[in-house]
Amino acid sequence: MLGYYHYGVILTYLSLVSSVIGISMTLNGRHITLAIVCLMVSGCLDAFDGRVARTRKNATDEEKSFGIQIDSLCDMVCFGVLPACIGFACGLNKWYHIAILALFVLAALIRLGYYNVMEMAQKNVDESGQRFFRGLPVTSIAIILPIVYGLMLYGKLLPWAGIILSVMFLAAGFGYVSQ
């Protein structure tokens, strides 16, 4: 079988499965809250997959590189596509909303691609050896979107949902690609 199957990458795979379930929950527009839960599960799994993978002392360079690549591919679905599907299911379905969602997904793609290039060139480390990141991490949407969604539902802001979500997706997208 192609690929690698150690604990860290299995967490990444589970994150993808959670997001695919979340995407399927948005298709009929009625299970948005479950899709939000799937997004949060993916965020939690993503928070630990790298840490778990780094505990493997005997990982080959190929396994490490595979883990980086598969994590970014998974992050694209989990924190790019799934949030956009949630936004669409929440009513962002006009042409200008779709343009905003497309820009959000594009920004996530650019951010993840840039991260991979910098990681491969080992340019994500400062002079003291500390790792750092540029731009807002795409996983942050797993915190931001549930909070905004909860405020909309329970804060009686549903009449403003389109504007609030549009601004949130634009701000997150610009955050992804900003220095």
Model regions: which residues?
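Alpha-helical transmembrane segments of integral membrane proteins
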Residues: 6-13, 34-37, 69, 73, ...
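Juxtamembrane loop-transmembrane helix junctions in multi-pass integral membrane proteins
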Residues: 2-6, 30, 62, 66-69, ...
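Multi-pass membrane catalytic core of lipid/isoprenoid biosynthesis enzymes
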Residues: 9-13, 55-112
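Topogenic membrane-insertion module of multi-pass membrane proteins
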Residues: 1-50, 175-179
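Transmembrane alpha-helical segments that form the membrane-embedded catalytic/substrate-channel core
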Residues: 46, 105-118, 168-179
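Cytosolic, membrane-interface loops and tails of multi-pass inner-membrane proteins
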Residues: 49-65, 114-131
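Helix-coil boundary and interhelical linker segments in multi-pass alpha-helical membrane proteins
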Residues: 21-37, 77, 81-102, 147-164
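C-terminal membrane-associated helical module and adjoining short loops/tails
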Residues: 125-179
